Amino acid sequence: ASPDARVIFYMTWGHKYGNRKPVAEYPLSNGYEGMQERLKTSYLEMAYDNGAWCAPVGMAWRAVRSERPDCILYRPDCYHPAVPGSYLAANVIFTTILQRPYQTAFTAELPAEQAEYLQRTAQRTVLDNLVLLNIR
């Protein structure tokens, strides 16, 4: 293995309406915010405990949900990503790995303005939080 190799934990996003079937061993608040906060805390703890980085996909989803509630991140099942959600996640991963803004002309057939917004959100979420994400 390369001495420059890094383990990167992929912070997932909360379900659209939160955890609808809580289990005693893993208590979560019913809503999206509670589930997302628990996921964020857990992924960051794993990154710190293992000397790894964290790709904050869930944090980027939270930002988009807050700033652009009309952006459809979820498929109809309310768990899996629609194209904009996958596009956002991919941009978070690239920005995390590169540790610099990742820009591409590829839009996944999204409107150009939406693709640019998702790219900027991914960049901002990663680059404004390098210490929190254990990258620096």
Please name every model-derived segment:
Residues 20-22, 26-122:
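Catalytic His-Asp segment of secreted/periplasmic serine-dependent ester chemistry enzymes
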Residues 10-14, 57-60:
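Active-site-proximal beta-strand/loop segments in catalytic clefts of secreted hydrolases
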